[in-house]
Amino acid sequence: MATTASSLLKSSFAGARLPASTRTPSSPAVVATPRGAGAIRASSISSSNPPYDLTSFRFSPIKESVVSREMTRRYMTDMITYADTDVVIVGAGSAGLSCAYELSKDPSVSIAIVEQSVSPGGGAWLGGQLFSAMVVRKPAHLFLDELGVAYDEAEDYVVIKHAALFTSTVMSRLLARPNVKLFNAVAVEDLIVKGGRVGGVVTNWALVSMNHDTQSCMDPNVMEAKVVVSSCGHDGPFGATGVKRLQDIGMISDVPGMKALDMNTAEDEIVRLTREVVPGMIVTGMEVAEIDGAPRMGPTFGAMMISGQKAAHLALKALGRPNAVDGTIKVVSPALRQEFVIASKDDEVVDA
């Protein structure tokens, strides 16, 4: 059955803005009343007893071999299914998860997420300096409304009381969809490149990848993909690996690294410069700052969400599907439509 453009993208880009909370000079910077579709009312919390007797609870019997077979059969089936897929997303931080969420709205697109850590989410489990709150500048709060994440609202930004509320919500919504598989504890060791185009990734168990120097040779596996989205984060021992590998193999000339912190410039630049940097590979999130020399962003997260969504629509465009980049899906909000500008691939380094 054909999917219409209107039904394909029921996202924050077609949503209505929430009015800013009215503040007086004596008001706190952040309004205390939670806003957003996920705001919880005390009356909605059920106080009923569990549907079983806790004093004499017993589980149904099971053979240990059944548990082993269920895990093994399902995982191996997923490996076979996603050995050749539409999109592979490398890195399950806030940008990668936002990209996967947006992409998976089209049920005909198969998506594999590869995350080296056992626990996906990247740096989005906390705000800055290990603090709990997550700050999101408007109008990216519309994405939170879509997800149903509650927040406190100020005039130009919103605050989620704990960053884990965003990460756990987008992850649970995403992984419930049948066209997505998260392969966590799996590392991407290299790219598949054929005829100047990225055509997939080379994978290995993360623990194996971390111990190549101490063990004998352990060859990897592969996943072919029509599009690879690299969301590996900023530079570090495990960061920006996608663009650094492109430089190693001569597909790009330079990875200048991100500049000093400038929140206002950085978030706009990261969204604007999210793009297909070489045929078959889209870069999103903080990895964009590494390849373009944009400023570092600091502890605000709106650009990660919107960059991920933009990467999803660039992937849809590459797949020949309706998308919000070339206008085959209409974006209602003019402010958000301006974010969807494809940066020139010729401009490799950006002066910020």
Curated annotation (Swiss-Prot):
One of its GO terms (biological process) is thiamine biosynthetic process. Substrate binds at residues 95, 115-116, 123, 188, 219, 234, 286, 296-298. Keywords: Chloroplast, Iron, Metal-binding, NAD, Plastid, Thiamine biosynthesis, Transferase, Transit peptide. One of its GO terms (molecular function) is cysteine-dependent adenosine diphosphate thiazole synthase activity. Its cofactor is Fe cation. Residues 1-41 form a transit peptide. Binds 1 Fe cation per subunit. The keyword Metal-binding applies. Belongs to the THI4 family. PANTHER family: THIAMINE THIAZOLE SYNTHASE, THIAMINE THIAZOLE SYNTHASE, CHLOROPLASTIC. This is Thiamine thiazole synthase 2, chloroplastic.
